[in-house]
Amino acid sequence: MGEETTTAVSFRALTEADIPAIVAIEATAFYDAWNENMLRNELDNALTTYVVMESEGKIIGYAGFWLVAGEAQVTRVAVLEELRGLGLGTRLTAALVNKAWELGAEAVTLEVRESNVAAQRAYLTCGFASEGIRPNYYEDNHENAVIMWLYK
């Protein structure tokens, strides 16, 4: 695990102009990386909220959720590959959770790969608890997903 960073970061809403930078992050973060059209569809969906994390004017991460019936379902949390392991994912997750609370969520949930211990640690640091397993959840390798919840 890397050193925690004190890098100055800011958070703001994702805009269409951010999509190329997000596609680049997606390509290194997910086997099923979203393309520009998929991201535009997410931006156009009234149920979704996405935030970007910036440092020195550069997008270094992003995250989002769908808010339905008082529950925020996290869809993505990703940090630039070269900045992983520095605690930025934890900071990004905390900002996302705060946004969910602002928008009226009573709970936040997500799935994370069983092998992604670093992400699970970040979510636990933010107050999430593991509440179950979805067997064979991921299509690429049939890995289990850990289901995590955080309640207001």
Give residue spans per PLM region.
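Acetyl-CoA-dependent GNAT
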Residues: 3-6, 10-82, 86, 93-95, ...
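Residue-level recognition of the GNAT/N-acetyltransferase active site
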Residues: 80, 84, 111-115, 140
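Conserved hydrophobic beta-strand within the GNAT/NAT acetyltransferase core sheet
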Residues: 74, 108-112
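Conserved SAM-binding loop
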Residues: 11, 85, 111-112, 130
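Short glycine/proline-centered loop/turn elements that form peptide/ligand docking sites
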Residues: 93, 115-119, 136-141
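Conserved catalytic-core motifs of GNAT/GCN5-like acyltransferases
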Residues: 111, 124, 129-146
